[in-house]
Amino acid sequence: MPLNTNNEKLTSKNVLNDRITKRFNDRRLFIVLLRFIIPSILVSFFAALYIFVDQIMIVKFVTRSDLNPDSIFDNDYFNFVDSNGQSWIYQDYLTASNNLKIPPFNINDLIRAAISISAPITVIINALTLLITMGLANQFSKALGRGDEEKIKEVWATGFITNVIVSIATSMIIVGVAKTWLTSSANGTMNRSLESLDTNSRYGYIVSIFFSRFRELQVQNASSYVYILAGLFTIQTFNQMYFLLNQSEGRQLFISIIPPLANLINILFDYLLIRYTSAGIAAAAYATVIGWSLSCLAYVIYNIVLIKKKATHLEYREIFRKGHFNWNYLYLIILIGLASFFRNAALSVSNGIFQTNLVTITEKIQPNLPPNYYQSIFGSVTPISNLMLQSVWGLIHGSRSLCGFKFGQRNFKDITKIYWYVPLIAFSYSSIVYLLFGFGLNNIFLINLFNIQGADNLVVSNLVLRITLVQSIFIALSMNAQLLFQSTQRIGMAWIASLMQGLFTFAPVFFTMYNLAIDTNNIYLYIWIQPINAILTCIGNWIISIPFAHKYREFVSKRFDIGTMLDKYLNKTKNPKVKAKQ
């Protein structure tokens, strides 16, 4: 009887593996690639839309208006009592700033500025959802390509347990450092603005204390938003894991339906919680977590159905079975996932540096403006640019499953084709989205969704938006390098490619453009830092990846890399087990 049961299990697994292989081995490689990329773009788009909708709802509904007449967030929100017991109201600041001919800030500026400084941390949160899941999906695809049943079980068990532990630990770390990070971003060197004010005069003193009040409230609101997302993002790591692993098994339809539905629920709860509670920005974060939770529940139910149908390798009983957790696969999963994490984390840090010094350079070049003027502008621009950037990254997520499977089959010819197909698709897609967001929907977004008021502010916002969006095209063109290196387990090269934009090219570009902007008294040279950085990154990544894409075998045999070393070690340690069974 046990023999029959084992034979049935083996037969069902063989049928499942054959079914998965057929999904990947269609001769029309470009069509297969599109089949994987399009759902990934949609999922990445809707994942970014979570944050985008939150930020729109924050801008439109948090502040008091006809849409939310009962809100506590109006210009009187700035009123406070100082340490000496003196009461100050917003009208005092308005009078002082008008007398000093300094454009005053208002409640909308505060909300946008809070969004702006929280953006780098939300990017890190997105990065952490990929830290384990991307390496797990890579190894899972490779195991499926080889048809190695034992490795499939070991990768699944190791990745699941690691994802739980790492996501909880990193969540605690982010919550611990968030307040310090946000305070630094809000401050910049904003105190330098006081140098141009006579703080001994009444008007100068009033403006200075309201600048401090603005920063205090900016950090307070951004913190409440970030704490909730950072504290509960473990749920989203499971969503990412289920999506990538189901995609690795060749499924597309159901996993592409869940994110849009969750987003609709997110919008509903955004409205209800922001409109009918006084939680402000925090309400939007709660709505996002509700959307995450419902998505996770849907994925789990779907996976249970697949398990009962014997249509998936993602069986929960295999997770804690003795011998399935493999420390060597743990190292590979983390090392491969670190490339995606490094990319997003480095971009987050570089964006934080950019945002912090934006205050400084505004003070130096345009001292007649509030120090947080351009930071507030980016509070409207950043959600739009992030929406485009995140959807562009869906290209690499989709193609990586196919590329990893081909690597498991040692099909290097198809890997080279994928390397060239991806930038072709990426350029077409990113160019269309650039024109749509930069010249088609720009005013609709800026005026109707982000409350940009005044013709001058609209002109500045449009210019900043179009400059910022340029980077998306070149990021899309350069992503094939990281795709190639991660999928073929060239971990060292993957790290270099992923750190190119956030570190290697950013440092020289930042210092050059920062000083050039000050020397020429042109703040837009500073704003061009991100696009120029993306262009140089594209050039650098193509230089290091093109030779590798066409001479894979030679590079594997002649070039040392930690990924290939670990892979060879795994194969050596596994062979004795196979012989023992024989």
UniProtKB/Swiss-Prot annotation:
Location (main, coarse): membrane
Signal peptide extent: none
Segments passing through the bilayer: 29-49, 117-137, 155-175, 225-245, 254-274, 287-307, 329-349, 376-396, 432-452, 458-478, 491-511, 523-543
GO molecular function, one term: xenobiotic transmembrane transporter activity
Key words, A-Z: Cell membrane, Membrane, Transmembrane, Transmembrane helix
Membrane topology per record: Multi-pass membrane protein
InterPro entries: MATE_fam, MATE_MepA_subfamily
GO cellular component, one term: plasma membrane
Coiled coil: none
CDD domains documented for this protein: MATE_like
Subcellular location: Cell membrane
Database matches in PANTHER family: MULTIDRUG EXPORT PROTEIN MEPA (PTHR43823:SF3), SPORULATION PROTEIN YKVU (PTHR43823)
Protein name: Uncharacterized protein MG447 homolog MYCGA2290
